[in-house]
Amino acid sequence: MNDHRPPGADANVYLWDRSGPVDEEIATLEQTLRPLRHRPRSPVRAPLAFARTPPPAGPALAAAAAVIILASVAAIVVNRSASPAPGWGVAAVYGAAVTRDGALVSGATLPVGGWLETGEDARVEVSVADLGVVTVYERSRVSLAAATSEEQRLRLGHGRIEAFITAPPRLFFVETAAVVAVDLGCAYTLDADAEGNGTLAVTFGAVALEANGLVSTVPADGVCRVSADRGPGTPYFADCRPELEASLAAIDAGDHGHDTLDVVLDAARPRDTLTLWHLLFKVDEASRGRVFERMVALSGLPPGVTRDGVLRLHARMLDGWWSALERSW
């Protein structure tokens, strides 16, 4: 049998001889045009006196159907090849910003694998698909790592960004050299140097900072410092007492002394159970008991949560306590 497929048709063999993987778009067209296909006549003799021979419409309709299918396939191929490369649109540029191709202008696209860098007093606003906006501030460098329906991922090489995202949780990510900021539906700012040291501040919603099995969940009005050596620190609220913030920084740096923890416990308010909840995972078991007692004194203990379970870091129990506490934050 002669092969009448055109050159380059190997990728679409289903169209020509229905072999190979089914092309869903071609199969849909076939189903739509099925009523028009040529059907051989039934071998039933017509009455001789009134027999009339209709025009051979079947083959003509079949030919027309083939033309329609070919035209549709051509349109599909053209549309596929003409689809724009994935990327984020540049909504606005204030001041000087550059890419690998030169000066960055409004209306350009930041492609996957591409980067942009802002100069002094510059700012760039980038649209994150249909999910929100990222503002890249002065003296910053970012690159786009992924732009798919499952993941939108930005790398912050250094500098500062502000994200306003309305996506479902765990769809938008920002990487630094030290952590990954996982959006849980929120607005936040993130600063980082080239090594990954920096600070996250959440305006609303929540962000999870993740690195090497460590997770710090930061709600609205929360702040969390990031260390290149230790990853995400312990979150605290921006309006906490100065002595709590200072002692917490010492604990995150490795000072787990009795006196340092005392300062944090004494300075804690009911709202600061955010900080104490995270400290449960960072201190030894003896100190964990002290943190537990202070949390109970500040906010009580919800049903289903026990001292023994907390000291053993029972995951489901701690999640339940978090859910009860966050209502007051």
Give the residues covered by each predicted segment.
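Short loop/turn segments at strand-loop or loop-helix junctions that form parts
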Residues: N2, A49-A51
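Flexible, surface-exposed loop/linker segments and immediately adjacent secondary-structure boundaries
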Residues: R34, H38, A74-W115, G119-E120, ...
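Single-pass transmembrane signal-anchor helices and their membrane-water interface zones
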Residues: T28-R37, V44-A49, P56-G87
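C-terminal non-catalytic accessory extensions
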Residues: G289-W329
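Short, charge-enriched, intrinsically disordered boundary segments that mark the beginning
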Residues: M1-H38
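Intrinsically disordered, low-complexity regions enriched in Ser/Pro/Gly/Gln/His and often acidic
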Residues: P7-A9, P270, H314-A315
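Acidic, Pro/Ser/Gly/Ala-rich intrinsically disordered segments
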Residues: N2-P6, D10, P56-P59, R100-D101, ...
